């Protein structure tokens, strides 16, 4: 299956897995927001440290604005394959199209590692 139009770079499965883990840790020891509305507000206000966007969102227009907004606000973002798994990592029983980490808590080093890897991926994708 091809990637939706809003996916600007390929994220390796192991990096997506780290993003899920970081969200779970931040949920327990820091602060997160879940859902596209809350995530959008946090990005607009410059509060988000890392944004997670699911690749299997239907219709894709729900999250299509997030990569552009993150670029504009210089906030790192990463794609994850499953909205269901994203919801679980965020601690809710339903799927989440997107989520963001505001305070990474004990996931600080993991978030920094993810941001570094994402920046390298974006650089490669731009070439």
From Swiss-Prot:
One of its GO terms (biological process) is tRNA 5'-leader removal. It comes from the Archaea. InterPro entries: eL8/uL1-like (IPR050257), Ribosomal_eL30-like_sf (IPR029064), Ribosomal_eL8-like_CS (IPR004037), Ribosomal_eL8/eL30/eS12/Gad45 (IPR004038), Ribosomal_eL8/Nhp2 (IPR018492), Ribosomal_eL8_arc (IPR022481). Keywords: Cytoplasm, Ribonucleoprotein, Ribosomal protein, RNA-binding, rRNA-binding, tRNA processing. The keyword RNA-binding applies. HAMAP family: Ribosomal_eL8. It is found in: Cytoplasm. One of its GO terms (molecular function) is rRNA binding. The gene is rpl7ae. Multifunctional RNA-binding protein that recognizes the K-turn motif in ribosomal RNA, the RNA component of RNase P, box H/ACA, box C/D and box C'/D' sRNAs. One of its GO terms (cellular component) is ribosome. Its main location: cytoplasm. This is Large ribosomal subunit protein eL8. Part of the 50S ribosomal subunit. Probably part of the RNase P complex. Belongs to the eukaryotic ribosomal protein eL8 family.
